């Protein structure tokens, strides 16, 4: 009964049209969640969310706890980690060429191109390319921190801190409630003409070998 009542509590936000998700390609909801991760993490340069952790679109209408659980059913924890730009580029290049869920980024534009038969990622902030040795503070979740980001962290994870960190649902609930109303077609989350992570083709990206 307690759990049922908790899931029925209103989330404080209302959607005007569904905020759509996607697994293979960039979509509004993972981008929005990456934005909120960054906003919820003091000092974060980047927000990074995995589309595989977003299970349904955010439907139109009032957001209740049950819907929030359905969108993010996993108890992933919100973490702040540090990686160099070169490491983040490597993670994004590998993801672009893979078949797992795409990664959603906030705070940077990640331009993915083919160069000499290899996948190249250029990270830009306000139009300027970041040098490889730039250290970035990334707001993400423990799934990514223990997975593709792990080998690129500037310092090892503190497992006690991971266990004490809030779940994504708890961390983002307040952020979502403060927004009041969401438009499913809001170009801040996804603009097909100006994606956050433009690619030379659909995932998995395959770069032809140089002649």
Residue ranges of predicted features:
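Feature captures C-terminal
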Residues: 27, 31-211
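Glycine-rich phosphate/diphosphate-binding loops and the adjacent beta-loop-alpha structural elements
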Residues: 8-28
